[in-house]
């Protein structure tokens, strides 16, 4: 089926041309079936089960673009932020010229959240858990959405990610607006059960566009079964006599690379990726990759950079989560170009990477947490995990005849078992996982999102889930489910996250924060307890980070720590010394450890290590020094910083519900942003630009030269900024980014010398009188009164417009219809509020929510549903009030 024939389905010519450039003139068979037989461009739900690289991703893309061009809002859901970034950049690059606005949202990409809440997008690429949080904060968002595409749908069976995805799909399924669902999944057993639950048509296609030889290499012979034809065959490889798993991997990679073929090797551990790359680089006779090494030399000095430099001398590299963003991008780019001949990667990154290749070599083992024994150990991978990795081989356009997926072993018995299991065996059945999640977390989520408000409604929603219909309803009596649900509700009520009023369950402010931030009930209870005890204390980053690290959510953030390191480093002694130095040693989180004689527990040592490491990170201690001090690599430090950034933001919201002054939330916001970028407070605004290659060292170089704001860079011009940075690649990306921002919002650049805040109403009144219009919004700061369209907005507790959001709204009112930068907004709040110190630049998403929510409460439902566009937040630029306003001071 030719792409051009899609014109019959009302696909416009500009989109058809984009598709032709992206995938060629012809659709693949599974794509043609989706359109002709399964109504891809219709209204029905659809699930596509097909192998990796079979073309199912483009099925989702076609449905998505057709819906977006039909003026429907679309969510594209992915499991990982790395995959979200990759898909966002791809879609933005591909469809910007067609007029589609593509945005992205994950825990550490929050700048588009306001636009999503306001419906100011066409396609939003969102991580599973983040959409769940967005729907809690803005449940009406579902009313605007016409299509939800779920990539990697098979993760509904994953014990870690499955519960969040299943609950999200349950909400979508039960929503009144009934958005259409298109699911994309690797092949699983009994797929009809999932299709039946989602009321979806089921397209199962097991063919691949390029033949794949799936088999096992043992003692120099690669026995395989062809995926499409089922034909059995064998190939001879060099037998170098290896017996250990690692040596067998290296031998296979060396043989294939020696033939001039590219190889991707999946191993079970991050350390193994580095070790194997170093060993093979030392013994393989492959050319030096000079261009990549030159690029690498311009990046920040890290241990990973040195290891990569060593392996790239033989066109070999490694890829794992310990690399920085810049290092990962470099490796991926040079591997896609074919210059890197052998790449060693962790199996956990198989899903997030789009690195197609002719040959994939697979270790065959994975690290698995055995709950029964409370420990980690090596286990065989599942069939679906194998398919996900092997599917990277033999991708269309990269392998003309066939690809290879190669498991390695020196045991002929093991080879026969694996060949049968992975090349011809049955797929695992779909097993629901919602029962694995704490039931109290599900209760809070459903209450906060408005999907349930009583015991019976909670039970009905849970029984409507995939787990409910396929497991609970069949294996658990009503009394058993009621007992479990009663316990979960009791935990929520006793923890202050829900109340009972006249037979109904109501979410509290604390419960709302718990659900919207996704931190879990157990973590919220512990953080709320700290917040109540500490609300009169000055904020200490060391204390906050230690408390966060000791919470359940903080403990779940992985950092390696050996027994030897635990004993030798004595992180308890280090953190008590730092606490004494910071004059916070008397605070409970530290004081309780002063008199301890026994060695610190593993959990305590791990929490102390994370807190100390993150304190060094935000104080701009050199990254190589941090690596040496805490025995971690730069990528891991950044990853932990990003994960804690989200947790600290949640702590700020929890603290306000526990009695902290609203104005103090900005202290948590500032700390959260510093954790994201690893900088001191004066570099935060430039860090928000998120320019790839503009790391901590270069940001500090700009700050030392007097630049802390984007406007200052624009005022001095490119020549001066280039001279200061002295880094060609980073400068070009930086200047391109801020130039685009200036083009998008020219009225805000260059920055005014002083923020102009209207302190009297006359100029606005004159403008309104001239146009014959009356103000929709009236703000009287002296009388502490706010009216919108004649409806009084509460300015006193409860559920009121608090002081800082009120002042910010007043600043926006003084520039009604104009864009106000976040810096100008902070300065305006200080001026109107007669503050001695200018507050930290606000979190625009949070501020917008706190301005809009009290206004919505004051309005009838029909008016409240239509004011999401009243206050606009523009990424990287500022905020704008979209109505006529009158301000009296």
Which positions does each model-derived feature cover?
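C-terminal helical accessory/scaffold domains
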Residues: 445, 486-488, 494-495, 499-690
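DNA-binding patch around the recognition helix
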Residues: 754-772, 836, 843-889
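Post-DEXD/H (motif II) to motif III coupling segment of the RecA-like Helicase ATP-binding lobe
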Residues: 155-211
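Short amphipathic alpha-helical recognition elements used for nucleic-acid or partner binding
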Residues: 791-834, 851, 855
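Conserved pre-motif I regulatory segment
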Residues: 2-49
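Conserved C-terminal RecA-like helicase domain
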Residues: 75-76, 85-88, 92-103, 264-344, ...
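Conserved interdomain linker/interface between the two RecA-like ATPase lobes of SF2 helicase motors
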Residues: 184, 191-197, 201-275, 317
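Conserved segment of the helicase C-terminal RecA-like domain
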Residues: 379-419
């Amino acid at each position: 089926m030719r792409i051009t024939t899609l014109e019959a389905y009302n696909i416009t010519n500009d989109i058809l041309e984009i598709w032709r450039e992206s995938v060629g003139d012809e659709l693949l068979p599974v794509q043609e079936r989706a359109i002709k037989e399964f109504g891809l461009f219709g209204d029905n739900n659809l699930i596509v089960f097909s192998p990796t690289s079979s073309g199912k991703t483009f099925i989702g893309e076609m449905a998505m673009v057709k819906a977006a061009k039909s003026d429907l809002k679309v969510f594209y859901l992915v499991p990982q932020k790395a995959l979200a970034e990759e898909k966002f950049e791809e879609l933005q690059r591909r469809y910007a010229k067609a007029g589609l606005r593509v945005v992205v949202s994950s825990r550490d990409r929050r700048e588009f959240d306001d636009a999503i809440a306001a419906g100011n997008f066409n396609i939003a690429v969102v991580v599973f858990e983040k959409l769940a949080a967005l729907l809690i904060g803005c449940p009406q968002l579902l009313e605007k959405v016409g299509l939800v595409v779920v990539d990697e749908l098979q993760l509904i069976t994953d014990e870690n990610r499955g519960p969040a995805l299943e609950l999200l799909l349950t909400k979508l399924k039960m929503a009144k607006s009934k958005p259409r669902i298109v699911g994309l999944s690797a092949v699983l057993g009994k797929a009809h059960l999932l299709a039946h639950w989602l009321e979806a048509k089921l397209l199962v296609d097991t063919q691949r566009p390029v033949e794949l030889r799936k088999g096992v290499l043992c003692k120099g012979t690669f026995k395989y079964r062809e995926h499409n034809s089922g034909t059995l065959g064998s190939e001879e490889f060099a037998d170098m006599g290896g017996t250990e798993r690692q040596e067998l991997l290296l031998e296979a990679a060396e043989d294939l690379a020696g033939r001039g073929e590219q190889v991707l090797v999946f191993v079970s551990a991050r350390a193994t990726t580095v070790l194997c790359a170093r060993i093979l680089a030392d013994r393989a006779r492959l050319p030096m990759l000079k261009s990549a090494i030159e690029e690498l030399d311009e990046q920040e000095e890290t241990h990973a950079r040195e290891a990569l430099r060593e392996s790239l001398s033989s066109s070999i590299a490694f890829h794992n989560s310990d690399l920085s963003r810049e290092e990962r991008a470099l490796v991926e780019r040079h591997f896609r170009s074919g210059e890197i001949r052998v790449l060693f990667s962790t199996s956990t990154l198989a899903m997030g990477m789009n690195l197609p290749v002719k040959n994939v070599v697979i270790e065959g083992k994975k690290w698995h947490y055995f709950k029964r024994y409370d420990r980690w150990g090596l286990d065989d991978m599942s069939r679906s995990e194998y398919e996900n990795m092997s599917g990277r081989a033999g991708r269309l356009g990269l392998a003309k005849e066939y690809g290879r997926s190669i498991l390695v072993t020196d045991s002929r018995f093991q080879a026969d078992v694996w060949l049968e299991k992975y090349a011809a065996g049955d797929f695992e059945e779909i097993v629901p996982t919602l029962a694995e999640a704490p039931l109290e977390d599900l209760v809070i989520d459903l209450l906060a999102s408005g999907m349930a408000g009583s015991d019976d409604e909670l039970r009905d929603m849970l029984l409507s889930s995939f787990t409910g219909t396929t497991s609970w309803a069949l294996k658990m009596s009503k009394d058993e489910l009621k007992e479990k649900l009663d316990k979960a509700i009791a935990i929520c009520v006793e923890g202050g996250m829900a109340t009972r009023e006249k037979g109904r369950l109501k979410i509290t402010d604390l419960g709302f924060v718990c659900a919207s931030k996704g931190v879990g009930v157990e973590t919220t209870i512990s953080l709320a307890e700290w917040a109540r005890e500490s609300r009169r204390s000055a904020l200490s980053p060391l204390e906050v980070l230690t408390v966060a690290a000791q919470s359940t959510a903080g403990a779940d953030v992985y950092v390696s720590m050996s027994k030897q390191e635990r004993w030798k480093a004595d992180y308890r002694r280090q953190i008590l010394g730092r606490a004494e130095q910071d004059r916070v040693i008397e605070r409970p989180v530290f004081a309780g450890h002063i008199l301890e004689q026994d060695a610190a527990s593993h959990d305590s040592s791990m929490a102390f290590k994370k807190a100390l490491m993150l304190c060094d990170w935000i104080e701009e201690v050199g990254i190589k020094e941090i690596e040496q001090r805490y025995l971690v690599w730069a990528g891991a430090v950044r990853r932990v910083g990003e994960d804690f950034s989200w947790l600290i933001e949640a702590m700020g919201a929890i603290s306000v519900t526990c009695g902290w002054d609203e104005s103090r939330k900005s202290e948590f916001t500032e700390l959260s942003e510093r954790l994201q970028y690893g900088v001191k407070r004066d570099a935060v605004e430039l860090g928000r630009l998120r320019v790839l290659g503009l790391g901590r060292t270069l940001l500090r170089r700009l700050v030392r030269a007097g630049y802390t704001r984007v406007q200052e860079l624009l005022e001095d011009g490119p020549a001066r900024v280039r001279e200061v940075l002295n880094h060609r690649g980073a400068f070009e990306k930086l200047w391109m980014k801020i130039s685009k921002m200036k083009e998008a919002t020219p009225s805000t650049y260059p920055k005014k010398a002083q923020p102009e805040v209207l302190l009297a109403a006359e100029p606005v009144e004159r403008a309104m009188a001239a146009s014959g219009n009356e103000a929709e919004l009236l703000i009287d700061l002296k009388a502490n009164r706010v009216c919108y369209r004649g409806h009084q907005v509460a300015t006193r507790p409860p559920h009121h417009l608090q002081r800082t959001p009120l002042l910010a709204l007043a600043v926006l009112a003084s520039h009604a219809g104009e864009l106000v930068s976040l810096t100008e907004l902070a300065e305006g709040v200080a001026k109107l509020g007669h503050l001695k110190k200018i507050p930290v630049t606000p979190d625009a998403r949070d501020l917008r929510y706190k301005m809009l929510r009290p206004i919505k409460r004051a309005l009838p439902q029909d008016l409240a549903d239509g004011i999401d566009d009243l206050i606009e937040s523009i990424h990287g630029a500022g905020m704008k009030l979209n109505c006529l306003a009158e301000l009296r001071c």
